[in-house]
A protein has these predicted regions:
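P-loop NTPase motor-domain active sites and their immediate coupling elements
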Residues: 1-11, 15-17, 22-23, 54-57, ...
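P-loop NTPase switch/communication element
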Residues: 18-24, 48-86, 90-91, 183-184
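The Walker A (P-loop) glycine that initiates the GxxxxGKT/S ATP-binding motif of P-loop NTPases
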Residues: 29-30, 316
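The conserved Walker
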Residues: 31-33, 172
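Conserved lysine of the Walker
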Residues: 36
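Hydrophobic positions on the alpha1 helix immediately C-terminal to the Walker A/P-loop
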Residues: 39, 43
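Short, well-ordered alpha-helices that flank and scaffold nucleotide-derived cofactor binding pockets
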Residues: 45, 49, 159
Length: 359
């Protein structure tokens, strides 16, 4: 199997391995210090020990800037390790375009999946397609920044990308329903649960309790997509020294065959012109002299329909941050649309109900 990975040992002391191509995507969750990042390093080490850059390409996302940056410079990477959450949606968009491109190639050659296509390439001496694996070390950061785009791209890739050799590994330390939505979970039948704080968190990950009784430090429950119940495993430990040795070994090689349209510039994975990387521009990042917030008219509609206005209400209704909601409310007060806040409740009355919105 091309994407075989060692998970650790079960309670009987037998080694446990899994195949990412059969999963075909993996969801990992657990509290801080439970062993998520160690497990990811374990999986990546297995890939790097068994596959060349011609066979496998990686996209690594590490918002914490600690766990995966040690892999920078290895020829398997399509771009340097992504540490800015703003670029991740663009990376997922690039993956979707690559998926569509591969499906077109399959259609032209009358093949069904990447294995059939690569076998055909062996006969015709054409260039094979590498497997593409996206590893996200913290999903919560993306879901807070751009929940709609993140969920949409992850779901589409999870549903369609399997046959094209594109696989996802997502990890989070916040196993809550707003991060691991029903749509995401439905497309990730293979899951790993490390130690969590409560049975509620365990149910979010595995759909039943048990992970709250794990010991931590690599103690995990692995739910295979074809297994009726999860298996308890102690994950393998790959030290930083071993990771550095592995990365240093691969840095000594040059890449002879690049993945199609390799995006290896600093502005990697940019979406099409005019398409923002984030769900909406952060108002606090805009210049003061620019026009009104793009959502100002929408905010006026909301406060008029509610009959009152408050910062917390705009946060809930519009799914925006406190700073942006506060600026919108201040601008409404400046234009005479809402009153000053009530000293006790901080709720504002609507002063203008029938005047035109901001032009």
């Amino acid at each position: 199997s091309p994407l075989k990975m060692a998970l650790g040992k079960d309670v009987a002391g037998k080694a446990v391995a899994a195949d990412l191509t059969a999963m075909p995507h993996l969801l990992i969750a657990g509290t801080t210090g439970s062993g998520k990042s160690v497990c990811i390093n374990d999986i990546l080490a297995c890939f790097l020990l068994n596959m060349t850059p011609d066979e496998l390409r990686l996209v690594l996302v590490d918002p914490k800037r600690v766990e995966l940056t040690g892999y920078n410079g290895i020829p398997h990477l399509l771009s340097p390790v992504i540490v800015d959450a703003e670029h991740v949606v663009g990376a997922l968009e690039w993956m979707m375009r690559e998926m569509d491109s591969r499906y077109r190639k399959f259609s032209e050659t009358h093949t069904r999946n990447i294995a059939d296509y690569n076998r055909l390439c062996e006969k015709t001496s054409e260039k094979k397609l590498p497997y593409l694996v996206v590893v996200v070390d913290e999903l919560a950061d993306l879901m807070m920044l751009a929940p709609d785009e993140t969920e949409r791209t992850i779901t589409r890739l999870a549903q369609l990308a399997r046959a094209t050799g594109i696989h996802l590994i997502l990890a989070t330390q916040r196993p809550s329903t707003d991060i691991l939505t029903g749509l995401i979970k439905a497309n990730f039948p293979a899951r790993i649960a490390f130690a969590v704080a409560s049975s509620v968190d365990s149910r979010v990950i595995l759909d039943h309790p048990g992970a709250e009784r794990l010991l931590g430090r690599g103690d995990m429950l692995f739910q295979a997509p074809d297994a009726p119940a999860p298996v308890r495993i102690q994950t393998a430990f790959v030290s930083d020294v071993e990771i550095n040795r592995l990365a240093t070994y691969w840095r000594g090689f040059t890449v002879t065959h690049l993945a199609p349209e390799r995006p290896d510039q600093p502005a990697a994975f940019q979406t099409k012109k005019g398409v923002p990387l984030k769900q909406a521009p952060l108002w606090e990042e805009m210049e003061e002299e620019k026009d009104l917030d793009p959502k100002f008219d929408e905010a006026i509609d909301i406060v008029r329909s509610e009959g009152q206005a408050s910062i917390s209400m705009l946060q809930r209704k519009m799914r925006i941050g406190y700073t942006r909601a506060a600026r919108i409310i201040d601008k409404m007060e400046e234009k005479g649309i809402v009153s000053e806040p009530d000293p006790k409740t901080q709720i504002r009355d609507i002063l203008k109900t029938d005047e035109s919105k901001a032009e």
